[in-house]
Regions:
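Cleft-lining beta-strand/loop regions that shape enzyme active-site pockets
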Residues: 2, 27-37, 53-63, 203-210, ...
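Bacterial N-terminal signal peptides
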Residues: 12-20
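Solvent-exposed, polar/charged alpha-helical surfaces in well-ordered, non-transmembrane soluble domains
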Residues: 42-46, 50, 64, 68-76, ...
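Extended, small/polar residue-biased N-terminal targeting/export presequences
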Residues: 62-68, 72-148, 202-257, 317-319, ...
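PDZ/PDZ-like domain segments forming the peptide/carboxylate-binding groove
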Residues: 76-77, 98, 112, 117-128, ...
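AAA+ P-loop NTPase catalytic core
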Residues: 157, 166-226, 230, 237
Length: 397
């Protein structure tokens, strides 16, 4: 990617961010309601179009040819193995092939979101089918018969009927069951594990919000310029800035989803959570409160939404209702109160050490520089802070 100055440019506003990378930075569920774009995303679409038009090194015209590329990329991003959409869906989307350029220029996201809504519908149909087949147990799978499964399906024809996808997903499921059998797992464990896996996938899909859909659609657009130009949603933009600045304000805990819970994976060394000695890896967070406020139950929430509640201004207090890792039942919760502080992510910073290596009875000292990631504190840089951190400056020092 060649940006105007061959440096990466970050644009961030209330509705999100657009990033040009220079190459270095590189159960039967109820049908969810269709996700609709909001006013900020309409503004962001128009702004992104203008930025790419005037700031990108590749001065491409937003025309029918680009619109066609956007549709192809969007469908590929959503369904790369052609395992969800039907040929009838694709035929319907063909009506949008030369309209997306005009849509984006006006900030009209109707067609982009309509495609996603259909994708979500097809996704749920596939997962419902898989979960139904799993309920039939091991008797549903005959491993004595010859069978084949097409793995690379990027160029496979779109299925004409739902029955074709049923056959594909049955074979996929059969392959997954067989793989687990070969690993030594018993039938009961296999079907429990797979049911949990697919149920989690379905739940995660149905938790997607407008900014997730918008980010996917806009990146189908930005990628037509080059693969390193991306649109960031507000949350993604915030996380990007945190990672680049190597600091955040919070409690210093790395979280991940596990079933319907948010689990603590590890504690950041010297962070408030570790210093409190009240939290441990594998503890599960079930509710969050700000200061003396009411607890908000977060079971079933997305991890990023839980993180939003836990992060906050330095010296403010957050209370967590936690289910300890060693709890024998789900009623043994405890309340943990932690004062937020600025967390330095030093493990991601440039590191140096001197190694002594012996060769032919002679010792040699070798200097080693380790770069876990590339970073730069843009906020401090733009504010004129002479001591702002970046990969280049830390290595030089």
């Amino acid at each position: 990617m060649a940006a105007i100055t061959r440096k990466h440019i970050l644009w961030s506003a209330a509705f999100g961010g657009l990033v040009f990378f220079s190459g270095v930075f590189a159960k039967q569920a109820a049908a969810p309601s269709p996700v609709e774009p909001n006013k900020e995303e309409v503004k962001a679409a128009r702004s992104t179009v203008m930025m790419l038009k005037h700031l990108h090194y590749e001065h491409k015209k937003l025309n029918d040819a680009l619109s066609s590329q956007i549709l192809d990329r969007y469908l590929k991003d959503l369904d790369p193995t052609r395992a969800y959409f039907l040929a009838s869906d694709i035929a319907e989307f063909e009506e949008y092939r030369y309209l997306l350029d005009d849509d984006l220029g006006r900030g009209d996201l109707t067609h982009g979101f309509a495609i996603y809504t259909r994708y979500q519908q097809r996704f749920n149909q596939r997962l419902d089918y898989v979960l139904k087949e799993l309920k039939k147990g091991s008797k549903n799978f005959d491993f004595t018969a010859d069978d084949s499964l097409e793995v690379k399906r990027e160029n496979a024809p779109w299925a004409k009927e739902a029955q074709e996808l049923d056959s594909l997903w049955y074979k996929r499921l059969k392959s997954a069951v067989l793989s687990l059998k070969l690993s030594g797992k018993k039938d009961e464990e296999i079907f429990k594990l797979l049911t949990k896996r697919y149920d989690t996938q379905r739940n995660n899909m149905n938790r997607n919000k407008a900014d997730d859909v918008f980010q996917t659609f806009m990146n189908a657009f930005t990628e037509t310029y080059d693969p390193h130009t991306e649109y960031f949603s507000p949350r993604t933009s915030e996380n990007f800035n945190i990672n680049m600045s190597l600091s955040l304000e919070g409690i210093g805990a790395v979280l991940q989803a596990e079933d319907d819970y948010t689990k603590i994976v590890r504690l950041v060394p010297a962070g408030p959570a570790e210093k409190s000695k009240q939290l441990k890896p594998n503890d599960r967070i079930v509710a969050v409160a700000q200061g003396d406020g009411e607890f908000v139950d977060v079971v079933g929430w997305r991890v990023d939404e839980v993180v939003d509640l836990i992060r906050g201004p330095k010296n403010s207090t957050v209370r967590l209702q936690v289910l300890p890792a060693n709890a024998v039942d789900e009623h043994q919760t405890k309340v943990v109160s932690i004062v937020r502080q600025t967390i330095k992510l030093e493990e991601q910073a440039a590191q140096k050490r001197v190694m002594t290596i012996t060769r032919q009875d002679k010792d040699y000292k070798i200097g080693v520089i380790k770069l876990p990631t590339f970073y730069a504190d843009f906020a401090a840089m733009q504010a004129g802070d002479p001591n702002y951190r970046s990969t280049t400056r830390d290595v030089a020092n």
